[in-house]
Regions:
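Peripheral, non-cofactor segments flanking catalytic/redox cores
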Residues: 1-173
Length: 173
């Protein structure tokens, strides 16, 4: 969404397409917080292989959480645009403030919020295989960022083709 769509262009279907569960579903944030607290209370122990295995598992979970943040960011942006359109905001101004709020939630600068939202939109709309690989822990958020950044000059169709080609070779991710 570039903010130039008509107000009726932001629909609930867009939020569903972003991969976020509909309203009424208990958010995972409570469970995630409980898991984080539990992990913080456990002292590292075990042999070297066990420690490395846990580090890998945690890295995979970080990737899955980054993918979830991307989906939530896209859904939030779409929801904000719809609310602003319903309030009569000019089409060119739709989405104002969304990236800054995402940045605040992620404890990042407002400028980085624009980059994070751009990354999320690219993954959700043009690079679904990269997003799926991120969710599966096949690559981390930084590597996903590099893929999005290096394909930024391509058309949406070409970017999607690169995404599909890279997905065929899971070792690439």
């Amino acid at each position: 969404m570039d903010g130039k769509q008509k107000p009726d262009a932001v629909k609930q279907a867009d939020v569903k397409q972003a991969g976020v569960k509909p309203a009424g579903v208990k958010p995972a944030g409570v469970e995630i917080t409980e898991v984080a607290r539990s992990l913080a209370a456990v002292r590292p122990s075990g042999n070297a292989a066990r420690l490395i295995a846990e580090i890998r598992t945690l890295e995979d979970q970080k990737s899955a959480l980054a993918a979830r943040q991307a989906r939530l960011s896209v859904a939030f942006d779409l929801l904000r645009r719809r609310e602003q359109a319903d309030a009569g905001m000019a089409a060119a101004d739709l989405g104002a403030g969304a990236a800054a709020q995402i940045a605040l939630a992620r404890r990042e600068s407002p400028a980085k919020g624009n980059r994070l939202l751009g990354l999320a939109k690219a993954l959700a709309t043009e690079m679904p295989h990269t997003l799926a690989a991120l969710e599966a822990g096949q690559l981390n958020e930084w590597r996903a960022t590099l893929l999005v950044r290096e394909t930024a000059g391509l058309t949406a169709e070409d970017r999607a083709a690169v995404d599909e080609e890279l997905a065929a070779d899971t070792g690439t991710f």
